[in-house]
Amino acid sequence: MISALQPISINFGTDGFRGIIGDNFTFDAVSRISSSLAEYLKDSPSNTVAVGYDTRVLSKEFAAAAAAALVSSGIKVVLSDNFCPSPVLSYFVKDKKCAAGVMITASHNPYMFNGLKFKSPFGSSMLESEVKKIEKIVNASDFSKKNKGKSRYIGRTGLDYSDNNNFRYADFKKDYIRRIIDLTELDKAVSGADKDLLKSLEVVIDPMFGAGIGYLSSVLKRFSIKHGSINNAVNPAFPGLNPEPIDSNLHKLKSSLKKKGIKNKFAVGFATDGDADRIGAVDCEGNFIDSHKIFSIILDYLIKEGRSGSVVKTVSVSKSIDDICKKHNIGLYEVPIGFKNIAALMTKDGNDVFMGGEESGGIGIASHLPERDGIFNALLLLKIIIKSGKNLNELLNGIFNEPYPYSYAREDLHLDEGRKLRLIEKLKSGSFDIPFKNNLAYSNFIDGFKFGYKDGSWLLIRPSGTEPLLRIYAESKAKNKTDGLINKVKTEINAL
């Protein structure tokens, strides 16, 4: 039995509610949040919520708790019959016209975390204004009394309710796979491809022990594309890594590609995070290809294929996107970090945004979903390689008429709350010693503290919205300058 609902304050971060399993992320918390969602949806035209979950400790059981609370509150529930990526849930919500989606995941966070995030009927992250309303409901003083006494039983093999049984299980995977194959037109790309290229093409998949296990491989198998997988067994401990597709977490994938690339320039690796909405890539030489470069390749391809309208990026994304948009006369919006801010523009009536992306590996294509999708983006990259006959580095060189021109870096600092607050106060008051202050061209405070320089370099100092961290970002056209910007900020922080 779930214990009585507790009046503990629940606050949502950049992308939902996250916490340490058994500490602040509990069955009680999941039930309270889910019951609050039901209350928020009571006047919705649709009365169905889809629930998905990743491969983390107790994710299946937390999903069952969410489903139980929703059904007990009068909501129809469709529960995934297996773990699934976040974008797979998002597609199901949009395709089946659900009122909302609930995803149990902590995305790229370490193994001890879990989380819950909401999906809108558009298949996007729920808008911040809506999440704030749910947060207000869940923390209302009379909420516990109103919901106390609703019987919920959480079973490892299913659900049982004392008040009703208005739910079903569904396979979320099948329709999603069909959709991404149709949208990428991978079948046409493969059938029209150079035969020697197809023989050379080899893909290594790293789902990082997460919810993307089995998705890319099922598509590649269908088209007889040579592939292999690493870290592809469910292991909630994420041994040896955090499930975030960044350079420092992909040693095994890079090593695998380095060996293959000696003989094959069309070897490529794709990694997805814990819930497979983010992507990282590795080239044939074993070099990490970050999200800025992936964003650049896909954006350039879509523009050349005739896409028009606008693009949206978060404040921490590379200036390379500005350069591509300027070159092709494409409008560009810059928004706070969090894909929900990109989704808000993608789903706004009358808006012409066809693509959006963030620094952390989340890229969304409006014709698919107003949502980041690491699996779809991996297939889109693969299609671009097949159609162009070029590998990732050749594609990048073609975009900029030179090797990728920017050096980008991010460093995460663990700061106690006191030092973090002192830093923020100094930044707000203007007393923080900004590096190369005399060369500043602009400042931008829409999310954190961003400073742009006359030579195009920039610096961003921002507290994380999902973790107890301070993040420092910098970019310039020279690695020593990028590193210098970060080091000067660290020196100033250490003096606090």
Model regions and ranges:
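Short glycine-centered, acidic/aromatic-flanked micro-motifs in structured strand/loop junctions
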Residues: 52-55, 205-207, 283, 367, ...
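An N-terminal, well-structured beta->alpha segment
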Residues: 1-73, 99-100, 160-203
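Proline/glycine-rich low-complexity loops and linkers
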Residues: 81, 133-177, 284-357, 363-365
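Phosphate-binding and adjacent anionic-ligand microenvironments
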Residues: 268, 307-496
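Glycine-rich phosphate-binding loop
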Residues: 99-113, 257-283, 288, 332-334, ...
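Gly/Ser/Thr-enriched, mixed-charge loops and adjacent short helices
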Residues: 2-7, 114-262
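N-terminal small/polar loop signature for handling phosphorylated ligands or for N-terminal nucleophile
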Residues: 39, 48-113, 218-282
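Buried hydrophobic positions in well-ordered alpha/beta secondary-structure cores of metabolic enzymes
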Residues: 15, 51, 89, 102, ...
